[in-house]
Amino acid sequence: MFARCVATIFASLLVTLAVASPEYYAPQGSTAPAPAGQCNVGNQQCCNTVQEASSDPVAGLLGLLGINVQDVTGLVGLTCNPITGIGGLNSGCDASPVCCENNSFGSLISIGCIPISL
């Protein structure tokens, strides 16, 4: 019981740290964001934070979820919500619109993300 409480508090702390971290900005020389039309509608997400999987907060969170950081390709989005509407139109995403391969962790984390333009 105590271990479960500690794990829950630790996970909450990691999420708080990850959300408080600065947003991801693509490094120079990276490719332009993919158009939203090239992403399946169900995979479009609006994430508060997008970071490399190897960043400290994200790597810690992935470890808690039992995901090997080396297995993650692309970026990781934190606290994401689905983008609704045709082609992302009228989505109201003021954060980081991304297209993610794995959204199976609810709104907590999305894996294998690439930036998209809406």
From Swiss-Prot:
GO terms for cellular component: extracellular region; fungal-type cell wall. Glycans are attached at residue 102. Its main location: secreted. One of its GO terms (molecular function) is structural constituent of cell wall. Disulfide bonds join 39-99, 46-93, 47-80, 100-113. Keywords: Cell wall, Disulfide bond, Glycoprotein, Secreted, Signal. Pfam families: Hydrophobin. It is found in: Secreted; Secreted, Cell wall. Residues 1-20 form the signal peptide. Induction: A CT-rich motif, which is often found immediately upstream of the transcription start point of highly expressed filamentous fungal genes, is present at the expected position. Aerial growth, conidiation, and dispersal of filamentous fungi in the environment rely upon a capability of their secreting small amphipathic proteins called hydrophobins (HPBs) with low sequence identity. Class I can self-assemble into an outermost layer of rodlet bundles on aerial cell surfaces, conferring cellular hydrophobicity that supports fungal growth, development and dispersal; whereas Class II form highly ordered films at water-air interfaces through intermolecular interactions but contribute nothing to the rodlet structure. Self-assembles to form functional amyloid fibrils called rodlets. Self-assembly into fibrillar rodlets occurs spontaneously at hydrophobic:hydrophilic interfaces and the rodlets further associate laterally to form amphipathic monolayers. Belongs to the fungal hydrophobin family. This is Class I hydrophobin 10. It comes from Flammulina velutipes (Agaricus velutipes). The lineage of its organism: Eukaryota, Fungi, Dikarya, Basidiomycota, Agaricomycotina.
